């Protein structure tokens, strides 16, 4: 009776641990902050000097220049135009042949009945191996996502990051993007192609019924780990 009482908590603990491993979340690709940090407290305005152009009113934007992102908190629209094609083929053919012959030309007369015609030996062997392998991958990702400038590098390049979430019925999808962009690559419509973004990290995932269907059950994964085949 005591063994049965002790066995129940152990089984319950094992089931709880197994349930915790039922859904292993994938590792994120975008690991930087997705929004700009909060602005610093406003500084006291400078004393008016009578000029028409006041930097305090226009920020760090020059007077005769388009308003393009250059400060933390500005937004940039990324046009996703990712397309990759890769193919690889391998073929290997190897062969090897070998032979050896061992014999005694003459033996003493008194040993004729013992070893005569018994030391002639022929040994041969062969080995052949053929292997082929092919792999290919095609990926296409198009769309748009608006990001925020989260940092400005010393050379003027902008660190951008952003996220877009879409919830449909019981499922949700999200797109995350981060990278470094040159302000000179940004067009007049405040857009830039994803192919012109350095250190680009693009993440597209979903949560819902479809995501659960594509995930192997925890008990099946357990037996797959324990199976030697």
From Swiss-Prot:
<keyword id="KW-0449">Lipoprotein</keyword>
<dbReference type="GO" id="GO:0003774">
    <property type="term" value="F:cytoskeletal motor activity"/>
</dbReference>
<dbReference type="GO" id="GO:0009279">
    <property type="term" value="C:cell outer membrane"/>
</dbReference>
<keyword id="KW-0564">Palmitate</keyword>
<dbReference type="GO" id="GO:0009427">
    <property type="term" value="C:bacterial-type flagellum basal body, distal rod, L ring"/>
</dbReference>
<dbReference type="Pfam" id="PF02107">
    <property type="entry name" value="FlgH"/>
</dbReference>
<protein>
    <recommendedName>
        <fullName>Flagellar L-ring protein</fullName>
    </recommendedName>
</protein>
<keyword id="KW-0732">Signal</keyword>
<keyword id="KW-0472">Membrane</keyword>
<keyword id="KW-0998">Cell outer membrane</keyword>
<comment type="function">
    <text>Assembles around the rod to form the L-ring and probably protects the motor/basal body from shearing forces during rotation.</text>
</comment>
<feature type="lipid moiety-binding region" description="N-palmitoyl cysteine">
    <location>
        <position position="21"/>
    </location>
</feature>
<comment type="similarity">
    <text>Belongs to the FlgH family.</text>
</comment>
<feature type="lipid moiety-binding region" description="S-diacylglycerol cysteine">
    <location>
        <position position="21"/>
    </location>
</feature>
<feature type="signal peptide">
    <location>
        <begin position="1"/>
        <end position="20"/>
    </location>
</feature>
<dbReference type="GO" id="GO:0071973">
    <property type="term" value="P:bacterial-type flagellum-dependent cell motility"/>
</dbReference>
<dbReference type="InterPro" id="IPR000527">
    <property type="entry name" value="Flag_Lring"/>
</dbReference>
<keyword id="KW-0975">Bacterial flagellum</keyword>
<comment type="subunit">
    <text>The basal body constitutes a major portion of the flagellar organelle and consists of four rings (L,P,S, and M) mounted on a central rod.</text>
</comment>
């Amino acid at each position: 009776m005591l063994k049965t009482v002790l066995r129940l908590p152990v089984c319950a603990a094992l089931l709880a641990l197994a349930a915790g491993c039922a859904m292993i979340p994938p590792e994120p690709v975008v690991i930087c902050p997705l929004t700009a940090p909060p602005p610093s407290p406003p500084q006291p305005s400078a004393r008016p000097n009578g000029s028409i152009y006041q930097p305090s009113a226009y920020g760090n934007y020059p007077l005769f220049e388009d308003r393009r992102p250059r400060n933390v908190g500005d937004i940039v629209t990324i046009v996703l135009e990712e397309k990759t094609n890769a193919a690889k083929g391998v073929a290997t053919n190897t062969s090897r042949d070998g032979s050896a012959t061992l014999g005694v030309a003459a033996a003493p007369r008194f040993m004729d009945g013992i070893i005569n015609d018994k030391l002639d030996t022929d040994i041969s062997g062969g080995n052949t191996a053929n292997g082929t392998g092919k792999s290919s991958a095609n990926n296409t990702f198009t769309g748009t996502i608006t990001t925020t400038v989260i940092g400005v590098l010393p050379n003027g390049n902008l660190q951008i990051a952003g996220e877009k979430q879409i919830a449909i019925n019981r499922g949700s999808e999200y797109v995350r993007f981060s990278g470094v962009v040159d302000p000179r690559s940004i067009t007049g419509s405040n857009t830039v192609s994803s192919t012109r973004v350095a250190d680009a990290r693009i993440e597209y995932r979903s949560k819902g019924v479809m995501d659960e269907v594509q995930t192997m059950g925890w008990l099946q994964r357990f037996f797959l780990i324990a199976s030697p085949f």
